UniProtKB/Swiss-Prot annotation:
It comes from Afipia carboxidovorans (strain ATCC 49405 / DSM 1227 / KCTC 32145 / OM5). The lineage of its organism: Bacteria, Pseudomonadati, Pseudomonadota, Alphaproteobacteria, Hyphomicrobiales. One of its GO terms (cellular component) is cytosol. The gene is rimO. Residues 373-439 form the TRAM domain. PANTHER family: RIBOSOMAL PROTEIN S12 METHYLTHIOTRANSFERASE RIMO, RIBOSOMAL PROTEIN US12 METHYLTHIOTRANSFERASE RIMO. This is Ribosomal protein uS12 methylthiotransferase RimO. It holds the Pfam family Radical_SAM. Residues 134-370 form the Radical SAM core domain.
Length: 440
């Protein structure tokens, strides 16, 4: 590093939106201390790799990213979920500068300071009030808690990130307000278990504006809806009180729920240690759609869980036909070091997992195509993510970034990223919509 030249850091962020928020917090602190971000590893003084350790495939991706950083730079700091169990990382890469687990912001900063001292003292005015974001300017993830109190047998998140720790309501709302003032049009509310928000702090009230707001899922959602941006609720565990948020939907609280049901067969759900009354869940879904006809449901499922029989898998397919989930992600079960599900009997062979994954996704493709076809001829509000010469790419209220479908928008007038426009839907395929800006 040349004398008087700001030190440069290259940053790789892997994993889920919660991990992305952790990366944003680290980058915000580093920028406050005068560090600059480099676009390439070989143009940086050091590299930070924020890892994912949830699945073996994610671990391999993390190890690959570390290897790439070592090859192109050689001075590498590793953090994130995989860093909570550093043995495999140390075995492959013994010459790393530091390895830390998730949420260990101070340890990461200490490692940076040791390897690359800041050029000058922090000047907070280097930063925008909302901090540094890795998402596009028009949307941002808003993390309301850390950790999880559930003990799903397939999951090691509580071991990596600990039990639930909720942020005070006023703290969340202040961050959200800063984001909206900075131009964010969509807030994506995330955590490991969004609907458990506030349980650990006994729903403690805090002062916000001229009133008190309790740290409850529904109360927080209501207040976020007053800020003027779209509010999208993700990672919602299906607790009974989730029913209370449905009547809030239709304005800025988007008619969208991301609920990871994981399966539909009662016995499989018991082995997963998940809520098992899926007949009641179907009744709740029907009630939600009666209250909010425009509701979009996204969910994730696991096929090939240990002991899953053909009959149990068929229950999942039948349930899906009844539930008519709008957006679906599916994972083939894979053992994760430290997960209690590893001890379950009757593992499902890989070829059967693949066959079931294909069958589930084919079933969902038909459901998705049918549900999207109903939107042809309607008008939808669309937020623009990308612009081209004649067609822009955006998302309706039914689409979360990165994981859901898109709306392809033809327009005679120029559109900008972040614009929210009314689009007349003219065509649908299995996952996406196509239309043109209304009024032209």
């Amino acid at each position: 590093m040349n004398q008087g030249v700001p030190p440069k850091i290259s940053f790789v962020s892997l994993g889920c939106p919660k991990a992305l928020v952790d990366s944003e917090r680290i980058i915000t602190r580093l920028r406050a201390e005068g560090y600059e971000l480099a676009r390439k590893h070989d143009g940086a003084d050091i590299v930070i790799v924020s890892t994912c350790g949830f699945l073996d495939s994610a671990k391999q991706e993390s190890l690959g990213a570390i290897g790439e950083a070592m090859a192109e730079n050689g001075k590498v700091i590793v953090t994130g979920c995989m860093g909570a169990e550093p043995e495999q990382i140390e075995k492959e890469y013994p010459n790393l500068l530091s390895i830390t687990g998730p949420q260990q912001y101070e340890s990461v900063l200490d490692a940076v300071h040791r390897a690359l001292p800041p050029l000058h003292n922090p000047h907070l005015d280097l930063l925008p009030p909302q901090g540094i974001k890795l998402t596009p300017r028009h949307y941002a993830y808003l993390k309301i808690s850390e950790g999880c109190n559930n003990r799903c047998t397939f999951c090691i998140i509580p071991k990596l990130r600990g039990d639930l720790v909720s942020r005070p309501a006023d703290d969340v709302l202040r961050e959200a307000e800063k984001l909206v003032v900075a131009g964010v049009k969509e807030l994506l509310v995330v955590s490991q278990d969004t609907s458990a928000y506030g349980i650990d702090i006994k729903y403690a009230p805090s002062a916000w504006k001229d009133r008190e707001v309790r740290a409850r899922f529904v109360d927080l959602a209501r207040e976020l809806g007053e800020l003027g941006a779209w509010v999208r609720l993700q990672y919602v565990y299906p607790y009974p009180h989730v029913d209370d948020v449905i009547p809030l939907m239709g304005g800025n609280i988007l008619p969208y729920l991301d609920i990871p049901f994981q399966h539909a067969n009662t016995e499989v759900l018991k082995r997963m240690r998940r809520p098992a009354a899926q007949d009641k869940t179907l009744a709740r879904i029907h009630k939600w759609r009666e209250q909010c006809p425009d509701l979009t449901l996204r969910s994730t499922f696991i096929v090939g869980f240990p002991g899953e029989t053909e009959s149990e898998f068929q229950d999942l397919l039948d349930w899906l036909d009844e539930a008519q989930i709008d957006r679906l992600g599916c994972f083939k079960y894979e053992p994760v070091a430290g997960a209690t599900s590893n001890a379950l009997e009757n593992p499902v062979p890989d070829e059967i997992k693949t066959a079931r994954w294909n069958a589930l996704m084919a079933r969902q493709q038909k459901i998705s195509a049918q549900r999207l076809k109903r939107k042809v001829g309607t008008r939808q509000q669309v937020i623009i993510d990308e612009v081209g010469p004649s067609v822009a790419k955006g998302r309706s209220k039914a689409d979360a970034p990165q994981i859901d479908g898109s709306v392809y928008v033809a327009s005679r007038r120029p559109l900008k990223v972040g614009d929210i426009v009314t689009v007349k839907i003219e065509r649908a395929d299995e996952y996406d919509l196509h239309g043109s800006v209304a009024g032209f």
